[in-house]
A protein has these predicted regions:
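Active-site oxyanion/phosphate-handling segment shared across diverse enzymes
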Residues: 136-160, 168-171, 286-287
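Conserved Nudix-box catalytic region and its N-terminal flanking loop in Nudix hydrolases
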Residues: 33-73, 159, 163-171, 194-206, ...
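NUDIX/MutT-family hydrolases
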Residues: 104, 113-143, 164-172
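Cysteine-centered motifs
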Residues: 3-5
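Residue-level signal for well-ordered, solvent-exposed loop/turn and beta-edge residues enriched
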Residues: 32, 83, 111, 162, ...
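Active-site segment of metal-dependent pyrophosphate-handling enzymes
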Residues: 76-111, 125, 226-227, 259-287
């Protein structure tokens, strides 16, 4: 989530709603990001998480003024080259909204100082996914890695700090429940692209449609995959298949995929569970 709570700077009250404005920056050097491990304050929404550096706007500040001041205060560095990468809208529960300007920086001067918000550490970019991060932060790390253009990301968390909704440039993103080997839910929800990048175990549904005939016994309906698909393009495949979205059940997901892919309206009584298969393979997925 990377919400940055330091007193009441940058807060606006709209009725019972608390609105905040902040900046967050990931400073780059030698293929590493400067990460802040928030281990100092007891009552910290980011307690034990790893985030970038930044903070809330002071009165009258622009995003860039806030960025430069916060980086200087927390790291001792003066940024000399930075890029505005995106705006992240956080919604937390019913009463907290934060608008966070997200930056990366690749040049700076100055001598590092100790940070009273936590411990600063340079971390290899390919190790970032191993850190204790907010699930929404994993999404914008993916975006920072995969695209150059400015983006708008909306992240909604419930009061249990579980990601409930994400949208990129106004378009909802797919979220999956991460599951255990026995199929039970871990309580973690990941965005589709993040789940695929990290190899997180998640559920899919595969449905074969059959009908009786007078010759071989049964016909099986196959679907020829589009040539633009990431996996097995142009191949004949299962009648219908798809991911199980976060919060959805297996049967309702199977019925949804039948309807969306084939236009078939079915009921739970029309389906027979054959079994559970665990599969794993490596491929390049786009989203």
């Amino acid at each position: 989530m990377a919400c940055i709570c330091n007193g009441l700077r940058g807060y606006k009250r709209e009725g019972l709603e608390m609105r905040k404005e902040s900046t967050l920056c990931y400073i780059e050097q030698d293929n590493k990001y400067l990460m802040l491990h928030r281990v100092v304050k007891k009552n910290d929404v980011n307690k034990d998480k790893w985030i970038g550096v930044g903070g809330h706007f002071e009165h009258g500040e622009s995003p860039e003024e806030c960025l430069l001041r916060e980086v200087k205060e927390e790291t001792g560095y003066t940024l000399t080259s930075w890029k505005y990468r995106g705006i992240v809208t956080f919604v937390y529960g019913e009463d907290v909204i934060e608008y966070m300007s997200l930056y990366t920086a690749d040049a700076f001067t100055g001598v590092p100082i100790e940070c009273d918000e936590g411990v600063l550490e340079w971390v290899e970019k390919d190790r970032i996914k191993e850190l204790n991060l907010w699930e929404g932060d994993r999404i914008f790390f993916r975006l920072l890695d995969e695209r150059e253009e400015f983006f708008s990301l909306k992240l909604v968390y419930n009061k249990s700090n579980v990601l409930e909704y994400a949208a990129l440039d106004g378009i909802p993103m797919e979220l999956f429940d991460v599951i255990n080997p026995d199929g039970s839910k871990t309580g973690v929800v990941k965005e589709r692209g993040v789940a695929h990048r990290e190899g997180a175990l998640h559920a899919t549904v595969h449905t074969w449609i059959v009908r009786k005939n007078d010759k071989s016994g049964y016909d099986v309906l196959l679907q020829k995959r589009s040539l633009c698909k990431d996996s097995n393009p142009g191949s004949y495949d299962i009648s219908s298949a798809g991911h199980v979205d976060a919060g959805d059940k297996i049967l309702e997901s199977a019925l949804r995929e039948l309807r969306e892919e084939l236009g078939i309206e079915a009921t739970e009584d029309d389906l027979t569970e054959v079994g559970i298969h665990r599969g794993q393979f490596e491929a390049v997925f786009h989203g």
